[in-house]
């Protein structure tokens, strides 16, 4: 599992398909059966959306939607990772 420290008391853990499949065993379909199908969205507020957008493009994340002002009050861009999960980088429009 890869862990990201988001705050002093908050970590985000991302587990590869094979790792979570061992834990879930036969209680759910194997995650590989749904590869490429969005199964979750990570919506991350960031300090510099343009920088995060450029970083995601640089590492080869699949662009889903460019940076846009959204009607819920955020500026957001969307990518998909190699497993098809959606990753959103967002900033509040009225900081």
Specify the residue positions occupied by each region the protein language model found:
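Vicinal oxygen chelate
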Residues: 1-47, 53-80, 91-95
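Conserved ATPase active-site switch/coordination loops adjacent to the nucleotide-binding site
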Residues: 83
